[in-house]
Amino acid sequence: MNKDIKVAKQTISTEIQALKKLLASFNRSPQFSKVVNLISKIRGKCLVVGVGKSYLCGLKTSSTLSSLGTPSVAFSANDLQHGGLGAIQKNRDVLLVFSVSGESAELNSILQYANRNGIPVIGVSCKPSSMLLRYSTIKILLPKVVESGHSLAPTSSSLNFLSWGDSLAISLMKRKKWTNKKFVEHHTGGSLATALIQVREIMAKGKEIPFISSNKMMRPQ
């Protein structure tokens, strides 16, 4: 077998095992439903926060949430530390914080700010005793997994964060009874929007339809 293909298959196999662990973790905790309940009731936005690769996972999750009916904005922890905290609406918004270790120093002041101001925090981490989960209103503990390669960069853990975020977005969509029509209202471009357009939305109507008498000549007289 080609060496490159062998490495690729090993990588995917490792990540499949990580996803299996994530799937099994849902059977051991009711916390996920608490997250859905909380976010479905907020009057503002779900602000997704992370550092490094966790922020990039949060960025994708935030985009999916917004596409499927849950208004959301993503922030890097660094941006929040330098004025971004002003974007948080007290008594309206909720923070969804991603961090594998839950110990990123950039999160400390943000979590303290949220706690002081009564802003709900949903912490998602792989470390049960982490700073993030200690500060969190709802604690989501994802399984610790083997990273592909030599564990030099987040791989399997990033995949689990993305899958968990997709699960949340779809669950909220179902809870809110989000329809194809509403999806198109927020997704005006691309093949997805085109495929969901109904004929009555683009057809000519009334005076827009060019009528002509049946006894008219086709050539000008």
Residue spans of the language-model regions?
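An N-terminal, well-structured beta->alpha segment
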Residues: 1-41
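Short, glycine-rich nucleotide/cofactor-binding loops
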Residues: 23-29, 94-103, 212-215
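Bateman/CBS regulatory modules and CBS-like beta-alpha motifs in cytosolic regions of diverse proteins
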Residues: 25, 194-221
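Short, basic/glycine-rich phosphate-binding loops at helix/coil junctions
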Residues: 9-18, 65, 195-205
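Short, contiguous, pocket-lining structural segments
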Residues: 31, 131, 160, 191-194, ...
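Short acidic active-site motifs
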Residues: 31-35, 80-84, 220-221
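Internal, active-site/partner-interface "lid" segment
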Residues: 134, 148, 174-206
